[in-house]
């Protein structure tokens, strides 16, 4: 049995059409399946949690197979609902606007071919899982936060605090984004919001602690991206050395660089060449603790729930069982 999780709003609203084509493939191959369509924020998490509760409790040795049809955000919501990562196998057919997970894993091609590969896979790719913990009470929630905001969140690609998360928060609530996505101009949304947030985002000071060692200060920081994979934000290679199986994060920390210089540094990040600019620092660690002097937006795989001034991020090595 395979459980299909579909975001019908993905692919500029064509997710449902894509599912209908894939459903034809499943029927043709006589594949036993169930289909679940999400209807709004938090719905995928609820569906996956119920599947885990119902299916995994019946048999202590059973394995739940899930195939996600959506973007990085849909995959992220799926992770929040999983109760036992050792007994859940996930396939992924990317239909989002960023697709950073698929970009780094080389998942590309016809949807029907991807589906066939997932169904035939018997040796999952074991991939690191990130776990974010908020340590302070939420003072400000995002405009599209779920009804219940947990103090912990999982992620597969990256977790960011500051400027990158502020872009995500505005993009998630942007009606302008939905319009441009339908016109095939989704990238223009992020460019517009990125320029706006570059002007509006206020910097702060923070301390960073890696693997429990001596904390160090980063003054006037713009953002800190903690990454499992190389890409974030639709193709920016912020961490070119990131390895999704090594049990460690790679960090891109942007300090007191002039905002005008950021306009030159960001395009260079598309090829991972941004560290030649001053005040952009690479770090790594299996555990990251950040204490900021005030709350900043925080994202996990582009999903934003709340602001925070105190977070811990831990890497759980090879916890995700990915079918591909």
Language-model features, listed with the residues they occupy:
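ATP/NTP phosphate-donor binding region
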Residues: 1-66, 76, 80-81, 113-115, ...
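Short, solvent-exposed amphipathic alpha-helical segments in soluble enzyme
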Residues: 19-22, 52, 83, 172-175, ...
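Glycine-rich beta-strand-to-loop/alpha-helix junction loops that act as flexible
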Residues: 8, 69-71, 93-96
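Short glycine-/acidic-enriched loop or helix-start segments at secondary-structure transitions
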Residues: 15, 77-79, 102-104, 166, ...
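A residue-level signal for conserved active-site and pocket-lining positions in enzyme catalytic cores
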Residues: 7, 44, 130, 167, ...
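ATP/nucleoside-binding phosphotransfer catalytic cores, i.e., glycine-rich phosphate-binding loops
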Residues: 15, 210-218, 237-324
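Glycine-rich phosphate/pyrophosphate-binding beta-alpha loops
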Residues: 160, 164, 223-239
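Catalytic core of DAGKc-family lipid kinases
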Residues: 3, 84-220
């Amino acid at each position: 049995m395979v459980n299909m999780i579909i975001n019908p709003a993905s692919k500029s609203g064509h997710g449902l059409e894509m599912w209908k084509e894939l459903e034809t493939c499943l029927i043709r191959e006589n594949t036993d399946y169930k289909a679940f369509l999400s209807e709004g924020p938090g719905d995928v998490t609820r569906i996956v949690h119920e599947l885990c509760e119902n299916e995994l409790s019946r048999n202590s040795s059973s394995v739940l197979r899930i195939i996600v049809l959506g973007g990085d955000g849909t995959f992220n919501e799926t992770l929040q609902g999983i109760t036992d990562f050792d007994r859940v196998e996930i396939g992924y057919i990317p239909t989002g606007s960023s697709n950073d997970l698929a970009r780094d894993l080389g998942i590309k091609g016809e949807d029907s071919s991807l589906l066939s590969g997932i169904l035939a896979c018997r040796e999952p790719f074991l991939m690191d899982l990130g776990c974010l913990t908020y340590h302070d009470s939420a003072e400000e929630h995002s405009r599209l936060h779920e009804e219940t905001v947990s103090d912990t969140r999982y992620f597969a690609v990256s977790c960011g605090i500051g400027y990158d998360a502020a872009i995500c928060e505005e993009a998630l609530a942007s009606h302008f984004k939905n319009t441009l996505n339908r016109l095939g101009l989704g990238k223009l949304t992020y460019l517009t919001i990125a320029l706006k947030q570059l002007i509006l985002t206020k910097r702060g000071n923070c301390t960073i602690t890696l693997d429990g060692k001596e904390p160090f200060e980063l003054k006037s920081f713009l953002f800190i991206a903690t990454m499992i994979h190389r890409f974030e934000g639709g193709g920016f290679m912020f961490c070119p050395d990131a390895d999704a199986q090594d049990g460690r994060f790679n960090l891109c920390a942007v300090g007191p660089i002039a905002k005008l210089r950021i306009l030159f540094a960001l395009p260079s990040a598309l090829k991972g060449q941004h560290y030649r600019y001053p005040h952009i620092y690479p770090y790594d660690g299996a555990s990251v603790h950040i204490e900021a002097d005030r709350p900043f937006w925080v994202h996990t795989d582009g999903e934003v729930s709340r602001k925070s001034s105190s977070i811990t991020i831990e890497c759980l090595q090879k916890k995700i069982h990915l079918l591909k």
